[in-house]
From Swiss-Prot:
Interacts with PspA. The gene is clgR. GO terms for molecular function: DNA binding; sequence-specific DNA binding. The keyword Lipoprotein does not apply. InterPro entries: ClgR-like (IPR049655), Cro/C1-type_HTH (IPR001387), Lambda_DNA-bd_dom_sf (IPR010982). NCBIfam families: trans_regClgR (NF041677). Keywords: DNA-binding, Stress response, Transcription, Transcription regulation. GO terms for biological process: biological process involved in interaction with host; dormancy exit of symbiont in host; positive regulation of DNA-templated transcription; regulation of DNA-templated transcription; regulation of proteasomal protein catabolic process; regulation of trehalose metabolic process; response to acidic pH; response to heat. This is Transcriptional regulator ClgR. Residues 24-43 bind DNA. Disruption phenotype: Inactivation of the gene increases M.tuberculosis susceptibility to the intramacrophage environment. Deletion mutant shows a significantly reduced ability to arrest the acidification of the phagosome. The keyword Transcription regulation applies. Residues 13-67 form the HTH cro/C1-type domain.
Length: 112
């Protein structure tokens, strides 16, 4: 199943906050949003309004366009992967008779 926009945006926001070494409290105070609500946004449970998303981006000193572009690129990668993966089969999760496995040749065997 494809990721929801709110989940991907939340991942981008959390990644930005963590890369800055900032806490939820710091960003929530700066953006004037409750810590719990910001946490839910980051976890993809809540979808922020455009105004709130802008406030969070301002608190992170990150242009809104950067967040949206990053989220769009992540979603595009997921969509390409989903199209490339045969229906009903998780990527790399199963091996069947049609799976080709390359085994490197053994140069020598040690005898104990």
């Amino acid at each position: 199943m494809a990721a929801l926009v709110r989940e991907v945006v939340g991942d981008v926001l959390r990644g930005a906050r963590m890369s800055q070494g900032r806490t939820l409290r710091e960003v929530s105070d700066s953006a004037r949003v409750s810590l719990g609500y910001l946490s839910e946004i980051e976890r993809g449970r809540k979808e922020p309004s455009s105004e709130l998303l802008s406030a969070i981006c301002t608190a992170l000193q990150l242009p809104l366009s950067v967040v949206l572009i990053d989220a769009g690129e992540r979603m595009a990668r997921q969509e390409r992967l989903a199209r490339a993966t045969p229906a009903g089969r998780a990527t790399g999760a199963t091996i069947d008779a049609s799976t080709k496995v390359v085994i490197a040749p053994v140069v020598s065997l040690a005898v104990a």
